[in-house]
Amino acid sequence: MVQFGLTMFATDYSVPLDILAGTAEKLGFESLFVPEHTHIPASRLSPWPGGADLPRDYWHTLDPFVSLALAASATKSLKIGTGISLITERDPILMAKQVATLDFVSGGRLILGVGAGWNQEEMENHGVAFSTRWKILRERILAMREIWTQDEA
C-alpha cells in the first residue's frame, strides 16, 4: 500500500510542528520530514540547486532534531525524519547520541535521512572542504554505525 508523508521547513513562522504532526497523523499521513541548514552564510557564492533565489525558509530553519522531538511528543504513530540531515556539518559522536535519543523517545519512529549538502560556504564554516564532503559523509556514517552497534567504539 502506498504511504504518504509530508516535508516542511520548520521555521519560526511556519505551522508549529506539534500542530502539523498531530493533524497529519489524524489525516492518515505516514510520516513528516524536516530539512536541515545550520545557517546560510552572509557571503554565499554557491548557487541554490532550485535555480532562482534561495527561499527565505533557508535562513530561518529550526534545528531538525529538536523540532522532530516536538512532533513526536504530539503523535503516537507518525514516523518522523530528517530530509536530510547534513552530517558533514555535525560532530558524529554527538549526532549519534542525538539520533539514538530521538529514536528512543519517539518509540522507534525516526527515519534518518542524511546527505552532504550543496552549500560550499556553509560547509566550510564547519571546517569541511567541499571537495571532501563525500569522504567525510562516509566516515561519519561509519563512525555512527560503530557507536550504535559496538559496546566500545
Residues covered by each model-derived region:
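N-terminal beta1-alpha1-beta2 module of alpha/beta enzyme domains
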Residues: 1-74
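Flexible, glycine-rich active-site loops centered on histidine and acidic residues
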Residues: 2-15, 45, 86-153
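Acidic (Asp/Glu)-rich catalytic clusters
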Residues: 25-26, 68-77, 99, 103-110
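Hydrophobic residues within beta-strands of alpha/beta enzymes
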Residues: 32, 80, 110-112
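Glycine-rich, flexible loop/turn motifs
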Residues: 44, 55-61, 74, 80, ...
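Structural motif corresponding to the early beta-alpha repeats
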Residues: 65-73, 79-88
